[in-house]
Amino acid sequence: MQVAGKELEVQQGALCGEVLKEALSKKQFKNVVVAKCGDTLLDLTTTVPADCTDLEPVMADSKEGLEVIRHSTAHLMAEAVKKLFPTAKVTIGPSIASGFYYDFDYERPFTPEDLEAIEAEMLRRVGANEEFTREVLSSADALKKFEEMGEDYKIELINDLGEETVSVYTNGEFADLCRGPHVARTGMLKAFKLLSVAGAYWRGDENRQQLQRIYGTAFPDPKALKKHLAQIEEAKKRDHRKLGTQLDLFSVNPEVGAGMTIWHPKGALIRAILEDFERKEHLKRGYQFVQGPLILKRELWEKSGHYDNYRENMYFTEIDEQSYGIKPMNCLSHMLVFKSRLRSYRDLPQRYFEHGVVHRHEKSGVLHGLLRVRTFTQDDAHLICRPDQLRDEIIGVAKFVGDVMGLFGFEYEAEVSTKPEKAIGSDEDWDRATEALEGALKEMGMEYSINEGDGAFYGPKIDIIIKDALERRWQCATIQCDFTLPERFDLSYVGEDGERHRPVMLHRVILGSIERFIGVLLEHTGGALPAWLSPVQAKILTVTDSQNEFAQKVLQFLREKGIRAEVDDRNEKLGYKVREAQLEKIPYMLVIGDKEVAAESVNVRARDGEDPGLKSLEEAAELISTAIDEPFKRGGMSYSFS
């Protein structure tokens, strides 16, 4: 069989670790976490499957290897918690994108001192180099085992699984219900850090037991961990909630409700500029503007399938004994626009666009500033086309996304998400849609990965993942294929043959949630938004009251040039005014003293530390305007806010 790219003769009953050790150098094998046969990950202590023809090592620095390390570290943490707090009950502890967590049921809150003690105990267990062992038990034996341990949550999980057998992993004195796989020994888990404690509900149900979730992170080596912890500290400084207050952009008031944003004047202006930019770009690309109501009759949501598949995330109200659903998506109104008149094949594609306000019931525990909210605005479009136009429409949207993300300086990558367990539509439709999405990306030469089972319930999708300045990944743009809703709403067009035909539809967003995108952009830039998007592009700072009259003249001049400017003529020291403007992330400060008044000029200071110095009003305006226009010229675009 093939082992790590080599042809080896493997004896029946050989262990994965033994076989890989023979195929690899000592240095290489030291970094092997688990083995892989096909799509299946295997413990190194597992016997090589009889039908395995290609065994590969999973290295510690790979994506899959990192997930295993983090999952194993979650078990290590649970072992330490049970040692120090024997009455704590364990629930679940998976790896996540940034690390891992484990949820515990314990009678008092865990403190920062507790986390330090848990970490110290984890390090002792690492030093002991305990083995991770896997045991397959009948469900009856597993129930007996966890009943003796008093682990009620594990008992519930076993009962819900309904399997004849389950696997249990043991490290040291700790046993856990788990599919695995895990590292061979705790000695491999040397680079970890416990980060915080948060509340959680058992199985995400707010009506069930409240638990304590300990978050942590782990890496293959201390250097990678140190880099990540430095990024966490930088992220705290860039937290968009902190910047939102500092820059006076938005607030979330408990009197209004959780997950609902109040936009202040400067924040509302940022939104208005973004939306204006998007409207103009959509017009250039042949989109038509539409707008639908906030609430629609429940029967429409039943017809679309949302009521059966999405109602737990929706809000409902009753008017005149008629049930209405507050829209979580904008697609239904757009389809009714298409259906409002007879369409010819010559009319297609139809591209409908709306900045639509939607409401979704997100659980309170996941709400987070602008990044996770209950009411938000989507830059939502639906492209209804002939099947032969589908690939070109996907390519057009993907290029649109690339232009916009390039404008903001984001690197991005694509993921194709395939059919989930809970889905509507035939396998044939899903296969056709998935092939169209992948084919478009291949035609563009865009690399992509497959995200199995993560499509929406009504169709596969392309997610565009952007990477910010802290190397965090965010999903913003989505291109989603849908053969199902045109069928449910009986959409049709008259073909060249004079017969009725069914169109196909793309759901798509570019920025996604406007709120979320602004939150991501604030953290990406640390609040120093590009000049074109800054609510105030220049601040005029006077040295004394004697310059106030000229400052107003400068203000009027800049505004006539289309530059958003303010005057700070308070009776404060210049240094104080400069520091405050820097905290407000103003792109340009224009200082006016007696010398500048006499020369009818300004002294320009840039946010990035450059000091252009004394400039005439025309020169200063030209300098600022060039900075505003530069990102658009770089991308072959043009824009002015109006």
From Swiss-Prot:
Spell out the subcellular localization from the entry: Cytoplasm
- Its EC number is 6.1.1.3
* UniProt GO molecular function: ATP binding; metal ion binding; threonine-tRNA ligase activity; tRNA binding
Family matches, as PROSITE patterns: AA_TRNA_LIGASE_II (PS50862), TGS (PS51880)
Q: Which cofactor does it need?
A: Zn(2+)
Q: How is the cofactor bound?
A: Binds 1 zinc ion per subunit.
InterPro entries in the record: aa-tRNA-synt_IIb, aa-tRNA-synth_II, aa-tRNA-synth_II/BPL/LPL, Anticodon-bd, Anticodon-bd_dom_sf, TGS, Thr-tRNA-ligase_IIa, Thr/Ala-tRNA-synth_IIc_edit
Lineage: superkingdom: Bacteria
In this chain, Zn(2+) is annotated as bound at 331, 382, 507
Classification via HAMAP family: Thr_tRNA_synth
Q: What does this protein do?
A: Catalyzes the attachment of threonine to tRNA(Thr) in a two-step reaction: L-threonine is first activated by ATP to form Thr-AMP and then transferred to the acceptor end of tRNA(Thr). Also edits incorrectly charged L-seryl-tRNA(Thr).
This protein is called Threonine--tRNA ligase
Q: Which organism is it from?
A: Maridesulfovibrio salexigens (strain ATCC 14822 / DSM 2638 / NCIMB 8403 / VKM B-1763) (Desulfovibrio salexigens)
**Phylogenetic lineage:** Bacteria, Pseudomonadati, Thermodesulfobacteriota, Desulfovibrionia, Desulfovibrionales
